[in-house]
Amino acid sequence: MRLDENEGAFTIPEFGKIQFEGFCRFIDQGLMEELHNFPKIEDTDKEIEFSLFGNEYELAEPFIKERDAVYQSLTYYSELYVPARSIRRNSRKIQKQTVFLGNIPLMNSHGTFVVNGIYRIVVNQILISPGIYYRSELDHNRINYIYTGTLISDWGRRSKLEIDVGERIWARVSRKRKISIPVLLSAMGLNLEEILDNTHYPKRFLFLLKKKERWEREEYLWSREKAILEFYKKLYCVSGDLVFSESLCKELQEKFFRQRCELGKIGRRNLNQKLNLDIPENEIFSLPQDVLAAVDYLIGVKFGMGTLDDIDHLRNRRIRSVADLLQNQFRLTLGHLEDTVRRTIHGATKRRSTPQNLVTSTLFKNTFQDFFGSHPLSQFLDQTNPLTEIAHGRKLSHLGPGGLTGRTASFRTRDIHPSYYGRICPIDTSEGMNAGLVSSLSIHAKIGDCGSLQSPFYKISERSREEHMVYLLPGEDEDEYYRIATGNSLALNQGIQEEQITPARYRQEFIVIAWEQIHFRSIFPFQYFSVGVSLIPFLEHNDANRALMGSNMQRQAVPLFRPEKCIAGTGLEGQAALDSGSVAIATQEGRIEYIDAVNITSSINGDTVRTESVIYQRSNTNTCTHQKPQVRQGECVKKGQILADGATTVGGELSLGKNVLVAYMPWEGYNFEDAILISERLVYEDIYTSFHIVRYRIEICMTSQGPERITREIPHLDAHSLRHLDENGLVMLGSWIETGDVLVGKLTPQTTEESLCTPEGRLLQTIFGIEVSTARESCLRAPIGGKGRVIDVRWINRVDDSGDNAETVHVYISQKRKIQVGDKVAGRHGNKGIISIILPRQDMPYLQNGIPVDMVLNPLGVPSRMNVGQIFECLPGLAGNLMNKHYRITPFDEKYEREASRKLVFPELYKASEQTANPWVFEPDHPGKHRLIDGRTGAVFEQPVTIGKAYMSKLSHQVDEKIHARSSGPYARVTQQPLRGKSKRGGQRIGEMEVWALEGFGVAYILQEMLTLKSDHIRTRNEVLGAIITGGPIPKPDTAPESFRLLIRELRSLALELNHAIISEKDFQIDREEV
């Protein structure tokens, strides 16, 4: 337990604080710790000594801005300098120099890294904490229970101790091989007397030893050498006689004890606490005393004198943050540096080498480049919207090195554990194979020094009944002794609380007790949930599965042309926008002197502060990042005031969608199965119009025939394709690009023989005698769906690792996408759907005041999905729209009184009806429902319909990026069937379910064409294409398709020959032919 520094003060912590604290811990502690552990290096003759002064390291200012690093595809880093000293003992000469070790990638203000121009983020990993854990499990016969103790090292390696049904104790060295504990203890250096003196159950231990074979008792308990030989045989499955040697002992020490038994500081602390040991924390490897104490505790567990561990409890888990991951990479790099210096220092005795000559800086660059480029926990930052960036930085992953995999993780591991309360969100997780393996931190959770997850609670004093905020660890104290009141008690005042029966959590169960017995209480209703879930209003009325979908789909919402803040929210929208870094904030109090679209200049006590705005910048996911000034020239601003809104913020609040008028009713089957029909107003008024910026790149390489050239003079291309190129061969800014247009003209040199190999080259040479060009065009063209406006062109020159000059051209194209049929829209409650039809405004159902509905949703999507929160959201949305009001509603308002949500919604509708003089807004006979009029006929619908203003978002699943068609394309080499997917120019593939659908309609000939002629019949499919073009009949094949030939070949590989026989009607002669 830890008392908070700001005792009594309550604020929601910054959402990116987890990442910032981790990186600062790496810079302040991790670097110094690893540099301090760097050993002194001497040559074999001990004439030269090399050492580093780790306490005096320095990090230089970055030589490039973060924004320039993105545009130039560079890494945003700082240079690490460390003083080094070399001593020559013969000449007694001491040299001390500041050496350049390498580049350390820096974290930016968003908690991310820029590596090779790409934003990346390091995800926190949740692992089993190193230590020993005792469990009971069924034996291989699934009849009897055996008791095991699993020792987990700092790197995730496991060693298991077990007591079998015959009460014999074993140590598992692999899944199939095990060794008896007396042999292991003797190999580690203990004799029988030391074993019996340091155990709590010496009689029980002797009783177990008597069950061993006689030869084992007598030989291996008294001879360490024989025990080591026996251990070596079991470990490596060696048969025959072995001779003891120190090299064999050293190999056993390095391969087994050093790799499997490295506990680390956290593991040593856990082991001391579990086994009641008093071993210093700097002893990071397991000792014979540890194994003996673990066996002793295992005997106690076997006979009911110990406790079994819950491996899924958070007290047995730890968080490996960005600090730990970067420190591991830094440790590996220093190990490589040590080896390099040792090799270099041997040849440095004769020549006068300085510390700078002994150190190479490429090791750091390569190591960190490999880590950020290929490590599973270094991920491509999802920048669809600001909420996505926040949620990505607060993820917890069970996957990665030392963790689990999607195939091996059990249901128990994926499930929600009671210890997650207030630490890990029980709702927000991935869908699919990674469900339960990728979670999200709760809003108030923080990571402790030892990697444990902490959650704040108010401690209630028994004497004064005062409250102090403390952070609780997920340890035994909380589970065994403390009673924690849930959020229901927040509404009670002091006088009522003492007489109130309160729901609480005690020993991982929920109970109801008197308020006097409460030790802690929750501090906030949002405490248990992640950021995305906390943005869902009326969350308590939704099923958890739909709340999960709503949280995930908020992160898929694209920034809109004109964003709008929600009418019904939760109150966290402001902090989400602020912590995301998408808004520009005044750093100090001052007065705005100058403002334009790019810069905002303010004066503070005569000093000028210039704030740069982000203008049409591309994100990792091709969405548009933009800032709009919100202050005026001459206006006085205060510190922390918003100067410019982002692409998804309005007034400093996160705005991911639009408030549209929705009706829950069926309409001619067009909203069947979650389909959605919308009004054309959403298209023509750019309600759901979004901007996307796509980057196309092309490299200029040095070939064996010479360098490639960027030019406008491209032979054999018509002028229409080259119309947008300038004299340098680059596309001009502001050009409107269509599919197939040339963006960058490039010629690649080739030999004359290569030119003459093409049919057109030989034809020109033979008929006209034209000299064939020695270069072929390799231009960058706009792909299918790549039309748009060119907003930027950048020619980047940089030197690669080999020293060559690498040139790259980047072309940025802005695309304006209106909503259309096939796009996906969703609300915040998991109510998602695809646009099925866009109706004219006059055909849409309209209200009694003549306003047509914007969107018609299927009412059957509410009761079966149990996400009634969308109904509670749209009704105050309608009232707020009529009265120009916004509501910020804290979830779980039922703690105030029963039916609190209903009592909030209906009075607001009544007020709106009174203020606007529209009695139809609130009709007592059916409150919340209204009479709608059919726009096509003017007739009133028979049943009243639920109408409201719902907050709907347009998601990144857009039809422009998914629709695909092909007439001909690539085929698989083995099956000769069309490839799959748009990226491979794949074709239509008829699977088993598609065959069933076609069989249901009885279309036998179409089915045969799709399965054979148009698929894998090589000769006939060419003829079919010609017949379709010319309008001729479809030819009938006379040979088998390729898939049937493949089946025959597979049968032949199994030594099964397939033939068919033809029997003549006249003489009944049998003619066998090979298939």
UniProtKB/Swiss-Prot annotation:
Enzyme class: transferase
Similarity comment text for this entry: Belongs to the RNA polymerase beta chain family.
InterPro entries named among the record's database cross-references: DNA-dir_RNA_pol_bsu_ext_1_sf, DNA-dir_RNA_pol_su2, DNA-dir_RNAP_su2_dom, DNA-dir_RNAP_su2_hyb_sf, RNA_pol_bsu_bac, RNA_pol_bsu_CS, RNA_pol_bsu_protrusion, RNA_pol_Rpb2_2
A biological process from GO: DNA-templated transcription
Segments for region (Disordered): 966-986
Subunit and interaction comment: In plastids the minimal PEP RNA polymerase catalytic core is composed of four subunits: alpha, beta, beta', and beta''. When a (nuclear-encoded) sigma factor is associated with the core the holoenzyme is formed, which can initiate transcription.
NCBIfam families, sorted: PRK00405.1
Record EC number: 2.7.7.6
Annotated protein name in UniProt: DNA-directed RNA polymerase subunit beta
Gene (UniProt): rpoB
Primary localization class, coarse: plastid
Function: DNA-dependent RNA polymerase catalyzes the transcription of DNA into RNA using the four ribonucleoside triphosphates as substrates.
Entry GO CC: chloroplast; DNA-directed RNA polymerase complex; mitochondrion
GO molecular function, one term: ribonucleoside binding
Keywords of this entry: Chloroplast, DNA-directed RNA polymerase, Nucleotidyltransferase, Plastid, Transcription, Transferase
Reactions accelerated catalytically: RNA(n) + a ribonucleoside 5'-triphosphate = RNA(n+1) + diphosphate
Subcellular location: Plastid, Chloroplast
